[in-house]
Amino acid sequence: MDKVTPAKLSWREDELGNVVPVSEIFGDVYYSLVDGLNESRYVFLTQNKLPERFEALFSRANSSAASNFSIAELGFGTGLNILATWQLWEHSKQQFHTYFNSQTNLQTSSQDHLKGSRSLTPRLHIISTEKHPLTHADLSRSLESWKHKDTSLVPFVDQLLALYPTLISGCHRLQLAEDVTLDLWLGDACFSLQQLANSYDTLPYGAHIDAWYLDGFAPACNESLWADQIFEQVKRLSKPGTTAATFSSAGVVKRGLMAAGFEIKKTKGFGRKREMLTATKLEPVAVSDDTSDNQGATEYDAKSTLALRSKEQVTLDTHAVTPNEQIAVIGAGVCGLMAAWSLAQRGNAVSLIDKEAPLAGASGNPRALLAPKMTPLAHVAEHLHSISYLYSQRFYRQIDQGEHKIFTPTTTLDLLQKSNVDVHQIAEYPEQMATTLSLDSARDISGLQQQDLTANLYLPQSGLINPKALADKVLTHPNISFKQANIKRITPLQAEAFDDVTEVSEVIEVTADITVQPAKRTKVMLHCESGEVLSVNRVVIAAAFESQSLDARIFEFRKIRGQLSWFEPTTEQLQALPTLPLKYSGYCAPFIPQPGDEAVNSVTPSVPTFLLGASFIRNDLDDEIRLSEHAINHQKLLTALPELSAVLPLPDTEADLYQRWQARVGIRSQTPDYHPLVGAVDEQGLIWTLSGMGSKGYAFAPLCAQVLADMMTAQFVPLPAALLAKLSVHRSSLKKPLS
């Protein structure tokens, strides 16, 4: 994929004194010189009837399973359309809650009501494409005047700027709010839409676009954004009733929309513009003409076969999870935690189940290093390490609002001893993501003045994750409850299997944290070692290498023993050790434990600690601490940093080593192709899995859990089809013999 080229801008003032960016590449303004914000509201919000559609969506939320609304935009530009849409969404939501509370005489506040009814709250999903994105500085400048013009936009603008991604090709998921998601696809629009549509086609059921914003530069300036190939993808991603709006009334736009099956209508344009176009996707109808050679040709008709479409939609969506379903997640490591979080954020009640406790397995290290394994820039859009890293560091920063920090931005220096890129390939990356430091800078930032650090990769956005703080955050979610239970067997039951069951409670013992749905909706039985049987609608298996014992269709992972070591340095050692995380053939990192960390590991809060790891022993399930693997971790560090030999010897005796060095052993689950399993295990969509992440769980799991939740709820996923195929539970590469 081509490298993203940022927009080249000049600036001018509009009639209201606002600073307006002008594209030097296309020779066109980004929005009207009359009033860009109101142009966005008129052309795209009003003409797509979003105020009425949002109101209807929220009005249904209290009486039925909530719906999602999806908008696709061609031309992100300055983000003004997104901001106006998001602002309207929040206004519609507040209007609904104000009305609902007044009608029901609720004594709680709107915010309390929102928390209590989250399972019925609709969600807004916006997908936008941009070939030449603005730099962060240019975006900030372009939006500054709108913050002054409409102060109610300030929090929306600030949040967008805080989440605005590094300009790397591919899809960047931004969680603007709990119920508002923006997938920003950077790169060629036709390619991005094709990737989106291909991902849609690979799933057993999929989402659709409800409204289109066709907001590229004028056809005379940018023909490629109005090409036939673009409208082919618009057709693939739309359904009958999908609307579209565009400022342009050019013939190429009319013809493209009509070819995509839309009925077009001219309406008054904004400001001095005489007219614009709106459009509605029609129902395809197969018609037979006995007098012609075109028997069975497809035409489009606004009023016919709507009943047929409804029937087809039931078939497509029959296995999709609805917002108020009860879901069990088995396994409370990082995969289970992230699966529970993503599903709970979508309104589902989630029971997180583990035979021991959260973080009892390989995910429970004192700290996890978030630093990607790099790839040449041309491959980055389909490289799971890279796109997961970009999403995860945003995710951890965004949810890090508690007393104890989840993510500490430390930066990381990679010594390129096990790297897929060299310094020349690193130079192609934006400096915000990766760069190479001079020898003096590398020495200064690491504190290693005698070490040869000429070959290096500096990762400015990387840092350390505190697993305990993350687990605590997840477990405070109002839609998540934890249950200790050892699940031994899973029995899926179709609804008709309950016809002979007169009383579900007679055969199922249910604990307080699992709510039994009506019999017709209960589809999965979880059989515990204790004899207790739990009833849920869906189950996600996230039990690492034990996942296969719960469902034989899950790949039997390669089992990798890993031992992480840590110790409390002396004052002399602390002065000599690196001051930031390093990657070499292993990795090391200084950190300071937080209060509460001692509940999971042998650490002392507030005392500087140094960790290093990790061993890598295949097909070994022993979880006892080994002195030999302390030595392995120690030797990896000294091989990379020989100058530390004098100040960091291993303790002389085994007793001293056991006393001064601590460790944790985890058994990691790995696939032959090093990609995790994400998706449905069965054809009915009752049993799912998120597993097999090896040592990359804290990097992969946040994004992969988003993908899983999107698949389960029939929404668009933020991955290209080629990468999605690499995560398939039943992919052909899993047939390769393990070694």
UniProtKB/Swiss-Prot annotation:
Cytoplasm among keywords: yes
Pfam families referenced in this protein's UniProt entry, alphabetically: DAO (PF01266), Methyltransf_30 (PF05430)
Keywords (A to Z) from UniProt: Cytoplasm, FAD, Flavoprotein, Methyltransferase, Multifunctional enzyme, Oxidoreductase, S-adenosyl-L-methionine, Transferase, tRNA processing
Record-linked InterPro entries: FAD-dep_OxRdtase, FAD/NAD-bd_sf, MnmC-like_methylTransf, SAM-dependent_MTases_sf, tRNA_MAMT_biosynth_bifunc_MnmC, tRNA_MNMC2, tRNA_S-uridine_synth_MnmC_C
Protein name: tRNA 5-methylaminomethyl-2-thiouridine biosynthesis bifunctional protein MnmC
Keyword Protein biosynthesis: no
UniProt region (tRNA (mnm(5)s(2)U34)-methyltransferase), positions on chain: 1-282
Molecular-function annotations in GO: flavin adenine dinucleotide binding; oxidoreductase activity, acting on the CH-NH group of donors; tRNA (5-methylaminomethyl-2-thiouridylate)(34)-methyltransferase activity
Record localization: Cytoplasm
The organism of origin for this protein: Psychrobacter sp. (strain PRwf-1)
Chain positions covered by the region annotation FAD-dependent cmnm(5)s(2)U34 oxidoreductase: 330-739
Chief subcellular location: cytoplasm
Annotated EC: 2.1.1.61, 1.5.-.-
Functional note: Catalyzes the last two steps in the biosynthesis of 5-methylaminomethyl-2-thiouridine (mnm(5)s(2)U) at the wobble position (U34) in tRNA. Catalyzes the FAD-dependent demodification of cmnm(5)s(2)U34 to nm(5)s(2)U34, followed by the transfer of a methyl group from S-adenosyl-L-methionine to nm(5)s(2)U34, to form mnm(5)s(2)U34.
Co-factor(s): FAD
TM regions (residue ranges): none
Catalytic activity of the protein: 5-aminomethyl-2-thiouridine(34) in tRNA + S-adenosyl-L-methionine = 5-methylaminomethyl-2-thiouridine(34) in tRNA + S-adenosyl-L-homocysteine + H(+)
Family: In the N-terminal section; belongs to the methyltransferase superfamily. tRNA (mnm(5)s(2)U34)-methyltransferase family. In the C-terminal section; belongs to the DAO family.
One GO CC term, this protein: cytoplasm
Single biological process term from Gene Ontology: methylation
Superkingdom per UniProt: Bacteria
